[in-house]
């Protein structure tokens, strides 16, 4: 029985990998055939396809940039690319679930097999210039492959689901603001595109990468609109009251950057409190008893803080060089702001009303 479960888990995990690795191989081979490579080694596109696949799981890389011979890293990876492995996992997992009646066991064995394959791919794809950080692969692929198998439509998840949908709504509003900012800075966007001059095929691939980076940029934009701010490399700061930028990389999506200070956005902190309040609104409305309201509100708030912290961490990172070591939000700063807002909302919606009821009951 155990052998059959393990075999099915490995088989379906390999199927999930193949569903996304083969398209990545096609893209890599097509790019190699049109642009070529300096070494002319046919293993380059094969390794590159694995790097694309690992990058879709947000696995960070160590880099040795040949032009400068300086070590660097790529930890700022496109969050939008997660949709591909999640789709592949959800496509393959049902057969594992059929083989193992206990759903949690099925999730564990599937995620374990998926993580093992990903770690092996990271090890065999290492080159002198690009090295996937293989020991971090389990920290990324196991949670992704495990969580992707969940059905969040269950009734017990409805409060968390509503909170997550609220966050998505605010995130989407920030994406709209990002688009408006790109339209307002069209000349800068055009100039950055001209500087890169990737050609037709390269331009299409570069456009795809920019689209996949939209969730990162939108989350950074949300942090800016809510008064938290972000960074664009070492020694920089962009917020409502500060604007210290030494230059911008030649990447079109950076054309959406603000051009100066906007002190009125300090009031965006009110939006942060509003976000948390809306997240907890169904709990406040449906639970009049203090204990039930406290339980559901605390659980939802804590899980929301964890989710926001993870998103903040994944949406930012180092972009190739040490000068761009911090591009995006500072994850612990976002977490601290969100935790403070959650504490204030819990105080005014759960604990103070509960205290008032207790005082009235004694009186």
Stretch-by-stretch model annotation:
Residues 101-161, 277-363:
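Alpha-helical transmembrane segments of multi-pass integral membrane proteins
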Residues 159-219:
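Loop-centered beta-sheet repeat module
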Residues 8-11, 69-98, 217-224, 265-288, ...:
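Transmembrane alpha-helical segments in integral membrane proteins
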Residues 2-83, 199-269, 313-336:
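Long, glycine/tryptophan/cysteine-rich extracytoplasmic
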């Amino acid at each position: 029985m155990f052998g059959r479960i393990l075999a099915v888990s490995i088989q379906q995990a390999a199927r999930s990998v193949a569903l996304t690795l083969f398209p990545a191989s096609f893209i890599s081979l097509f790019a190699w055939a049109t642009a070529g490579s300096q070494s002319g080694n046919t293993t380059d596109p094969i390794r590159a396809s694995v790097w694309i696949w690992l990058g879709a799981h947000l696995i960070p890389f160590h880099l040795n940039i040949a032009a400068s011979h300086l070590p660097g890293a790529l930890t700022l990876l496109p969050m939008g690319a997660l949709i591909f492995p999640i789709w592949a996992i959800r496509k393959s997992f049902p057969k594992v679930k059929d083989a193992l009646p206990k759903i949690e066991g099925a999730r564990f064995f599937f995620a374990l097999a998926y993580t093992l394959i990903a770690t092996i791919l990271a090890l065999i794809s290492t080159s002198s210039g690009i090295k996937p950080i293989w020991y971090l692969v389990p920290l990324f692929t196991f949670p992704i492959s495990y969580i992707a198998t969940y059905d969040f439509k269950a009734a017990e998840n409805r409060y968390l689901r509503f909170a997550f949908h609220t966050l998505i709504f605010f995130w989407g509003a920030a994406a709209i603001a990002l688009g408006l900012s790109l339209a307002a800075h069209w000349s800068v966007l055009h100039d950055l595109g001209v500087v890169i001059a990737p050609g037709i095929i390269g331009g299409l691939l570069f456009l795809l990468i920019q689209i996949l980076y939209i969730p990162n940029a939108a989350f950074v934009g949300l942090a800016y609109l809510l008064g938290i701010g972000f960074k664009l490399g070492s020694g920089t700061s962009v917020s409502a009251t500060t604007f210290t930028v030494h230059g911008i990389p030649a990447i079109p999506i950076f054309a959406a950057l603000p051009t100066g200070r906007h002190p009125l956005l300090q009031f965006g902190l009110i939006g942060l409190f509003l976000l948390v309040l809306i997240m907890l609104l169904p709990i406040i409305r449906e639970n009049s008893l203090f204990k039930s309201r406290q339980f559901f509100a605390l659980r939802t708030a804590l899980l929301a803080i964890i989710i926001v912290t993870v998103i903040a961490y994944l949406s930012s990172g180092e972009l190739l060089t040490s000068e761009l070591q911090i591009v995006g939000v500072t994850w612990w700063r976002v977490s601290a702001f969100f935790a403070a807002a959650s504490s204030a909302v819990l105080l005014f919606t759960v604990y103070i009303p509960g205290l008032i009821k207790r005082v009235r009951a004694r009186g």
